[in-house]
Amino acid sequence: MNNMKKYIPILMIPVLLVSCKKDFLDKQPHEFTDAVFWKTAAQAESALAGVYTPLQDEEALGGEEWCSIETFGDNAYMNDNYSDYIAMSEFRALQNNEGDLSHNSYVSYYKTIKRATDVLTNVPGISMDAAQKKRILGEANFLLGFSYYELAARYGGLPIYDSKDPAAALVRKTEAETWAVIETTLKNATTQLAWEHEEGRPGLGAAWGMLAKVYAYEKKWSDAKTAAETVISSGKHSLTTSYADIFTIQHENDAEILFGLGARLGEYPITPVLMLPNNVWGGTHPEPMGEGWRLVSATVNLYNAYQVGDLRKKATVAKRGVDVITYNGSTDILQAPNNQSPIVCVKYNAPYKDEYTGWAAGLNVPALRYADVLLIDAEAIMNLNGGGPTTRTTTVAAATIPFNLVRRRAGLATIAAPTFNDLMYERRMELAFEGGDRHFDLVRWGLAESIYNALPAEGTYKPARTFIPTRHRLLPYPQGEIDNSNGSIKQNPNY
């Protein structure tokens, strides 16, 4: 009993319920008890809005941890601060004592999990319009599956929240059991959501797209292909013409965005400023660029890996003393004197080109894009036709169409019969700095050891690393959660 009292404040935080305004993400939180709540359609909508809120926490989607997870791969590094997190990203840590980024993001995702589960438990009993109820349940299922996915990719097996069984919060399911829950939850969402949806909310494309990514993790290639091609054949989604435009406020709700978490100007997200260099801390609009936290920056390895003519390079990275950037109305050569590497991520700089508007620029977080789904489709086709991580040079002509849609948009020549090596390149360059896909890809492909361990040190900011698959395939589980459970929750292997 004492164990439960210690753990409940973290995993079973009361649902935040919010009043109605025009923007469902701008509502103010209020708490209600089940005795007076879960009675009307308005309350159901209010509860659903509360499910989204934790994803906008500082360390959650688009926040510090979401940006910093990129440093586990070979695309990025952390400039300073958060020594415990840096130790994990350099595969030196034997414990996860990082109480800010890692643990706080874990808590934020579990807040969403708890609130989504409450919606799924209570909304079915409300007398309301059937179509509205179906949509609410679909969004809750998507957000539940999405949050579990983000955590499972990091930590493996998870406690599965059950409002009827509080003790379940103290026991981790196996990885297979956890992925099965995610799969089932997203399948439910595919039966409840519609292709048409409001901005900032998931639709049917998001549900099928996330399901395709889950199947790829599980190596269920036929299922991954079917899920991805359900999105493709719908005709509801397409690539934005210019890659750079995707990361602008003007195009943040394009058909390419399957799920983009809505922004609150002046409040959320802080993604752009986390990537901006810090030329003058506390200065007023220093030129030519820099009033950021310089939390995460790009590696020389990434900068040099772009193929000649790849338009994604200019839209993603810039080199000190070489590349011209526009910031706060001025165009000049990048300086970034305080960056440890000469490379800066400029992917989210667009809101600041004309004017620096504060740390929260109002740019939606691109949580899932159509390009990702196209590349999952190509990957599934390759694995079904002799290509894959162990046959990386095998050509697979059947993957040409989805593969080349992405490659052509980047300004590169099409490849008639792409290989898995070609796919690896496209996924790296297409999805850089979008929540750690590079690292998660290399891990699920079983290639992290060979690629990471072969990389030389890049200054002191990105040292040579030793990735041990039996340990580093998963991050160490947050020590705070283990302690709060009095050891009922177990650490990942070999930590």
Residue ranges and their predicted role:
Residues 1-29:
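Bacterial Sec-dependent N-terminal signal peptides
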Residues 19-21, 76-81, 109-112, 181, ...:
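Long, intrinsically disordered, low-complexity segments
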Residues 21-83, 187-190, 201-335, 452, ...:
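An aromatic- and glycine-enriched ligand-binding surface/loop that stacks and positions planar moieties
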Residues 82, 87-98, 304-370:
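Flexible, polar/acidic helix-loop-strand segments at domain edges
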